[in-house]
Amino acid sequence: MYANSRKRSNVDVHRHPYVVYGSPFDLEPSRINQGVPVWKQEARDERNRKRFHGAFTGGFSAGYFNTVGSKEGWQPKSWKSSRNENKSVHGMTIDDIMDEEDRADQELSKVYTSKINTIDTSIPIDDPLLREFSNRDDSIGEKMLKNLGWNGHDFVISPFQGYYDDTKLTNQAYHGIGYQADDVFQLERKPVGMAKNLRGGFGSGVLNDDGIEDQDIYDLGAPKMRYDKSINITKKVASPFTPVKHTFLSKKDRSKGKSIIKSQNCSDGLPPLPGFVVVFNLQSPFQNNWFPPPTIPEGWEPKLFTNSQGFSQKKAQTSNERLPLFAEKSETNSNGEASLPSDVNHGVKEDEGSWQLIDIETAKNAMSRKDNPYNDERAGIYEIFLKAHLMNMPRLLRDIDSRHLLEFTQTASLYRPMSKNLSMRFVSSFEASTKKESINSHSETDDSILRRPRTVVTFIPERLLCKRFNVALPYGQEKQKRKNISSIENVPIIAEIENKSIDSIDTRKLNRPQDIEEKPKAPQTLFSAIFGDD
């Protein structure tokens, strides 16, 4: 049964798919130009060109194209005249000789076709002849049906459909994906029932054999060129073992002494059962090859490893035992005695009190307080922390968390005695005096400092400095050259120069009149003529 083949009218094709109900109302004037795209906002002429000249008619070309060299325009890097090239390249087109009327006629003469293929819609879907002449694109559903064998009318079954059906085959791919199968596992299979049929007789093809006509004179045989290192030499590949089938020997064969394969012993060293043969040798690739260990020469002793008993007998060093190691690396004083820095000496504690986080006085003050700073389960742990320092029992701190130990140490440090706080913040006068004495003794004994050159320079202030302090220039505008007085070995002369009084300076230089050329001042009449009121 065919569908209606009548062509649809243009009214049905271009009919709006929705039903309009009611009368549309006009938008507000302020909302008419809303949502206009950018390409509609550009000023173009009737030929869709941006060629408006003049500030009041668009100003696009006048403000952009004709502003070469300005900030808003295009700045050429190199200029080259194209006067001669334009003559050869330029050619007349039909648009150059057409006016507005010609363009209007050309626009009317154009033929527009609808994108909707109305002819194809009237073709029945089951007519194969008309479907061949149709030129529309197939839909996605039709493409999927064609891939399944649909030709437009019914499904065509391929003759090779049964050839590609999955069959139950034995899995022999033991080598895995991405690897190549080994020839060892490909056991040879003898054809069953073929050897009995190939016994006697010959065919009639021997009588009809011409011999010469079927022979190719250009036949050179199989290609002898191979991608091997050797040519015309068949290289024998030695297999690790020869695959053998399980074979049962009858009594008749055993009596005649026939044996297909020489029997071998099993892995346990015993011969196989009568009538059976071992398939794999003992030296199969599945067994690991164990090589004998290297022979150790006589008298050899290891150098990198010591006796294992030495590790258990060795004890950890205490802080007092490690102290000489740090002292050797420290600087030595003038007497040759090793001296540690102050921070190292302060951190070194005795072995007995190395575990203590607070001193005993701080623990007593914190224990004497009746109000416990903690109200939860930490209150009991805090008392155990203080009792461990008072009773000198470090084993009580083993079960306390490290975070609680840090928190209890900061809490107990608030009850540290005042003398302890002052000693940590200030330095005693005895230590300060010893440092000064060490500096003085070092300066007195060091003769290299006295042998350095010293200079005595007369102070000549700058002119701006004298002006700021309202002091006259001591030497005038001409600055004298500074005289360097150096003495390396004569120390008494240096002392005399340093103790020289100010009176020894030459006073004649101070009392010398200033040689400043003063310019004549302008007369008063000039100022009155300029700034005076008439």
Curated annotation (Swiss-Prot):
Coiled coil: none annotated. GO terms for cellular component: cytosol; nucleus; spliceosomal complex. One of its GO terms (biological process) is mRNA cis splicing, via spliceosome. Residues 310-321 have a biased composition (Polar residues). InterPro entries: DUF1604. The keyword Calcium does not apply. Keywords: Cytoplasm, Nucleus. Residues 310-346 are annotated as: Disordered. This is Uncharacterized protein C20H4.06c.
